[in-house]
Amino acid sequence: MARYSESVCRLCRRENLKMYLKGDRCYTDKCAIERRPYPPGQHGQGRTKFSEYGVQLREKQKVKRMYGLLEAGFRHAYQNAAAAKGKTGENLLQTLELRLDNVVFRLGFADTRNEARQLVRHGHFKVNGRKVNIPSYLCRPGDKVELKDRSKKVVRITEALEAVDRRGVPAWLDLDKGGFKGTVKTSPAREDITMPIQEQLIVELYSK
């Protein structure tokens, strides 16, 4: 499957937002957006004025990059959100948050969503006792996500868990750090998603 393979630090600079795509580096003064808080490229420090469409597109691109999705996956998530009851924008964010790769990241088993996606694909996790290796698998309230026994000694996982206190675990999740498992207590509410996202702009873009 195609994935963005260039420097993820450029993505944060493009969106002028620290999206924590680089793991521990994002918490240090080595973070690219701290050192160069302007878009990459020859004209990065120039001022750019976006049209209404441009503003909507930038918001969509930002959220796609934040969750590490390509257009097809993101559009599929939007279509599911639009078909569900409630506000489409909030449904979209809830869908993105409940993806298994994001839940693994939020619980602290990985430093980044990209790393969480790889861990899920490589079969390191079980959901309710069954192996699930599909990153887009949607978790539900009550689901238990746990590390397989053979994976409890994987260094990058144990190191990520050691740093979980710095990042924190959202209120809608419960982590049993010593047991290498977590529980989805409830669906995330809008106020649980603290990154600066204007989801209505995405709804307006896809509604055109």
Swiss-Prot record:
This protein's record includes keyword RNA-binding: yes
Gene Ontology MF, one: structural constituent of ribosome
Lineage: superkingdom: Bacteria
Boundaries of every S4 RNA-binding domain copy: 98-159
A single Gene Ontology CC term: small ribosomal subunit
Oligomeric and partner information: Part of the 30S ribosomal subunit. Contacts protein S5. The interaction surface between S4 and S5 is involved in control of translational fidelity.
Name listed for the protein in its UniProt record: Small ribosomal subunit protein uS4
Lineage: Bacteria, Pseudomonadati, Myxococcota, Myxococcia, Myxococcales
